[in-house]
């Protein structure tokens, strides 16, 4: 019996008190065996008696009470009582001591003893005994009231001892001191063994886990690296993919703006929105621009280009003769059609007559050339302007030498030929290059009237224009001898002036004719000379062309042939010394003498 029990026993005044105490302990043990035995968490069983309300109202016991044990699930089978103790030895520390069960004979109690405070406790893992209240379904233990009228001064606490090894039941033998007192010990009760908690095999991935040997012993969950998931950290998280080259889970890095989700395939390619491309969906496809929160926008090129700048959206490589940021304009030299299609057509403007560009106004069907060159006019710059005429489809300026008034005659010259119209300043001719009859050019190239000095009968002179001289005849004066002389002089001057004017008019034409005649004569003479030389050479060739003969020796004759066709019947009699040889009709000579008699 431990020290606490011994002190309690010594406090009893007599052996009768000891007997009454034994009876009370036996009654308490009998009550505990009736249904107050509980198992503690698979580690040890404990007796949980619940004190009656009467005992709770009594004065406190000199022994320190332990806290109520933690509620445990009831065991199946016959109830057993196990008495255990904790590692503590002093009551002041709150650790219970071993009190072996006492078996006594059933004796009716004359007077009730003070109620025993039976507070079994289950030790916790740290060595202290936690307390718990008994379940309400369990009956309260039997208490014995004292026969004496004095309040009790002591109480007996039944405790349980925690085994040295959790979960291993041990049988305690009764204390020898109890045997010396004559109380038989209670048979030891052993607790049924309980199964230990299951231990999980971690089996963590060497690549995906932080530690292959460390995991949660309850769930088996391993500690994973970033990007790995699963019980064993053997799969990739969302937003990661397994790179088969390195065998690791790598992040997808899908763009939140261009990708449909954060997921990617086994190659690391994200699923892109419409108009977005790239393995991470972070750039625009051809034909799209403006990568942003909504993805990419299609290029606005009026169906004239398939590509544009990925940042600004400016169209590139505009087709169909168009230009502009969105291919909405026509190139230089083209104009948009008046219909809804707005197709670009070439301007009907020649680059020779205009700048080549044109415009079309709203509501018009034909374009107008922007700017015509000098000398051209019209909607398409295909007409000659006033003061110009058409010379081989080119507008050439009229050459009237300033003798046509452009105000009175805007055209100045005829558009089809260039002949000047309404020559002024006493001029005439195709280009107004001649002076009228009776006019001559002065030093400034102006046509002025020609004047001559005419003597009068009084001995004075007067200035008379050439025109008046040719049209008027002076009246004979008193001096008849002077009159013929005067008339002769006047007419002589007039005739000389007229001849000079006529010579000036005809000289250029005659000069041209003379030059042409000389050229023709020279050409004819050269042709005659060449023909004469050719005839002479032919004659010499015919004269010197002698016949050439070839002689072929055969067995009994000599054959010859001429290489000149102009002598078909040449005389070959001189080829042989013997004149008696006859010439065969076929050109063969018959030999009448031995072969050594002729000469080659």
From Swiss-Prot:
The chain crosses the membrane at residues 513-533. It is a single-pass type I membrane protein. Residues 1-34 form the signal peptide. Residues 202-251, 252-298, 299-346, 347-397, 398-449 form the Laminin EGF-like domain. SUPFAM superfamilies: EGF/Laminin (SSF57196). Disulfide bonds join 202-215, 204-222, 224-233, 236-249, 252-264, 254-270, 272-281, 284-296, 299-308, 301-315, 318-327, 330-344, 347-358, 349-369, 372-381, 384-395, 398-413, 400-420, 423-432, 435-447. Glycans are attached at residues 36, 179, 203, 216, 243, 265, 303, 357, 426, 466, 479, 498. Residues 33-199 are annotated as: Disordered. Keywords: Disulfide bond, Glycoprotein, Laminin EGF-like domain, Membrane, Repeat, Signal, Transmembrane, Transmembrane helix. It holds the Pfam family EGF_laminin. Residues 534-600 are cytoplasmic. Residues 167-182 have a biased composition (Polar residues). GO terms for cellular component: basement membrane; membrane. This is Multiple epidermal growth factor-like domains protein 9. It comes from Mus musculus (Mouse). The lineage of its organism: Eukaryota, Metazoa, Chordata, Craniata, Vertebrata.
């Amino acid at each position: 019996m431990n020290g606490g029990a011994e002190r309690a026993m010594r406090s009893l005044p007599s052996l009768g008190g000891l007997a009454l105490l034994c009876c009370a302990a036996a009654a308490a043990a009998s009550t505990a065996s009736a249904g107050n035995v509980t198992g503690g968490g698979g580690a040890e069983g404990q007796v949980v008696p619940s004190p009656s309300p009467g005992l709770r109202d009594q004065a406190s016991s000199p022994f320190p009470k332990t806290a109520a044990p933690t509620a445990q699930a009831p065991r199946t089978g016959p109830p057993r009582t196990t008495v255990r103790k904790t590692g503590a030895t002093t009551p002041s520390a709150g650790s219970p001591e071993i009190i072996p069960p006492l078996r006594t004979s059933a004796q009716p109690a004359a007077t009730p003893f003070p109620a025993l405070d039976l507070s079994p406790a289950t030790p916790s893992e740290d060595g202290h005994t936690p307390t718990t209240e008994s379940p309400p379904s369990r009956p309260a233990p039997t208490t014995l009231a004292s026969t004496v009228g004095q309040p009790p001064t002591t109480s007996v606490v039944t405790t349980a001892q925690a085994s040295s090894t959790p979960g291993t039941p041990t049988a305690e033998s009764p204390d020898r001191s109890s045997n010396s007192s004559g109380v038989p010990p209670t048979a030891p009760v052993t607790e049924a063994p309980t199964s230990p908690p299951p231990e999980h095999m971690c089996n963590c991935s060497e690549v995906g886990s932080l530690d292959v040997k460390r995991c949660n012993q309850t769930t088996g969950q391993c500690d994973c690296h970033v990007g790995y998931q699963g019980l064993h950290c053997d799969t990739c998280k969302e937003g990661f993919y397994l790179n088969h080259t390195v065998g690791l889970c790598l992040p997808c890095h899908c763009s939140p703006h261009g990708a449909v989700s954060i997921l990617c395939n086994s190659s690391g390619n994200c699923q892109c929105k419409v108009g977005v491309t790239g393995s991470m969906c972070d750039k625009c496809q051809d034909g799209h621009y403006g990568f942003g929160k909504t993805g990419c926008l299609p290029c606005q090129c009026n169906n004239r280009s398939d590509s544009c700048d990925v940042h600004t959206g400016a169209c590139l490589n505009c087709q169909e003769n168009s230009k502009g940021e969105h291919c909405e304009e026509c190139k230089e030299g083209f104009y948009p059609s008046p219909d809804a299609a707005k197709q670009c057509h070439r301007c009907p403007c020649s680059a020779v007559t205009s700048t080549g560009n044109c415009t079309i106004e709203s509501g018009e069907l034909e374009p107008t050339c922007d700017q015509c060159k000098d000398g051209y006019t019209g909607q398409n710059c295909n007409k000659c302007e006033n003061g110009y005429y058409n010379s081989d489809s080119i507008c050439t300026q009229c050459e009237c030498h300033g003798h046509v008034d452009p105000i009175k005659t805007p055209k100045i010259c005829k558009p089809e030929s260039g002949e000047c119209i309404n020559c002024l300043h006493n001029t005439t001719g195709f280009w107004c290059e001649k002076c009228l009859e009776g006019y001559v050019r002065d030093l400034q190239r102006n046509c002025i009237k020609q004047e001559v000095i005419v003597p009068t009968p009084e001995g004075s002179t007067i200035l008379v224009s050439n025109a008046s001289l040719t049209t008027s005849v002076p009246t004979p004066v008193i001096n008849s001898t002077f009159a013929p002389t005067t008339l002769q002089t006047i007419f002589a001057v007039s005739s000389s002036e007229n001849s000079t004017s006529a010579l000036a008019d005809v000289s250029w034409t005659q000069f041209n004719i003379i030059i042409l005649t000389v050229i023709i004569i020279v050409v004819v003479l050269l042709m005659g000379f060449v023909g004469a030389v050719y005839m002479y050479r032919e004659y010499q060739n015919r004269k010197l062309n002698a016949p050439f003969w070839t002689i072929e020796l055969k067995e009994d004759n000599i054959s010859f042939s001429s290489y000149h066709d102009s002598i078909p019947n040449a005389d070959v009699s001189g080829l042989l010394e013997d004149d008696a040889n006859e010439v065969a009709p076929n050109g063969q000579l018959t030999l009448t003498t031995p072969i050594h008699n002729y000469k080659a």
